[in-house]
Regions:
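Short-chain dehydrogenase/reductase
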Residues: 7, 67, 71, 102-110, ...
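N-terminal Rossmann NAD(P)H-binding glycine-rich loop of SDR-like oxidoreductase domains
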Residues: 2-27
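Conserved beta-loop-beta element that borders a ligand/cofactor-binding pocket
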Residues: 94, 99, 111-134, 140-141
Length: 248
């Protein structure tokens, strides 16, 4: 098997994927990021992509930017894969609800899905629910105020990033699988309840106040567009995530 590229390979998810691929015995795993020592690549302008892509057979595309640029980055990745002529499968990590919740970041992820599907290249797309880490970050940010304000009526189904990395490593094979079944966490809870659990685990004494919001994106979350109840395949619960994390 040829080389495997992991974009965003120094990020939280990408680093986990890289570790799993190497543990599985893959010798040519190429870590791509702007600051990677061997394959420094800037996806926003394509610099370094051709050298990194040479002879590669699989790409696991984990790189993303909440502030925009994902579509441009995907375009450069697709063109580099075409030039290389050896790439048989681009594995892309997406989000459950990108076609249900009109959030700017979600729209960008959906646009990348469509670019990949229209590229003529072999593609595998995995959508997952939000990571435990994201719920913890949202709760931690909200806890900086005297009263913790979290969106009212929003339910989440968080999943462990490690479990998603396991699945991405499984999918990183030359044969593309198209859109594969979604991955959701094992439990669904109100975000406010998980916020309270986070505060209790950290020993933070704050009152959580459900805050009603406006807009189509908020309505999409309230409708449950971000959930995958039929695909609750995750194992680690948010409570277990908090227990393993401790007070950090």
């Amino acid at each position: 098997m040829g080389g495997i590229l992991v974009t965003g390979g120094t990020g939280n998810l990408g680093a986990l994927v890289v570790a799993r691929l190497r543990e599985a015995g893959h010798e040519d795993v190429r870590v791509l990021s702007r600051h990677a020592p061997v394959y420094p690549v800037d996806l926003l302008n394509g610099a370094g992509l051709d050298a990194a892509m040479a002879g590669a057979e699989v790409v696991v595309h984990c790189a993303t930017a909440t502030r925009g640029g994902d579509e441009v980055a995907a375009g450069h990745l697709i063109e580099a894969a075409r030039r290389a002529g050896t790439v048989r499968n681009i594995v892309y990590i997406s989000i459950v609800g990108v076609d249900e919740v009109p959030l700017g970041y979600y729209r960008s992820k959906l646009a990348v899905e469509r670019l990949l599907e229209a590229s003529g290249l072999g593609v595998t797309i995995l959508r997952t629910t939000q990571f435990h880490d994201l719920v913890a970050r949202v709760s931690g940010s909200a806890a900086k105020l005297p009263v913790v304000l979290l969106p009212k009526g929003v339910r989440v189904q968080p999943i462990a990033a490690e479990e998603v990395a396991d699945r991405l490593a499984e999918l990183a094979v030359p044969a593309p699988a198209g859109r594969v079944p979604d991955m959701g966490g094992p439990e669904t809870h109100a975000l406010t309840d998980l916020g309270r659990a986070y505060l209790a685990a950290r020993g933070i004494h704050r009152r959580v106040v459900p805050l009603p919001l406006a807009g189509k994106a908020y309505a999409g979350f309230v409708r449950g567009g971000n959930l995958a109840p039929a695909h609750a395949v995750g194992k680690k619960t948010f409570a277990q995530f908090l227990a393993a994390r401790g007070a950090s």
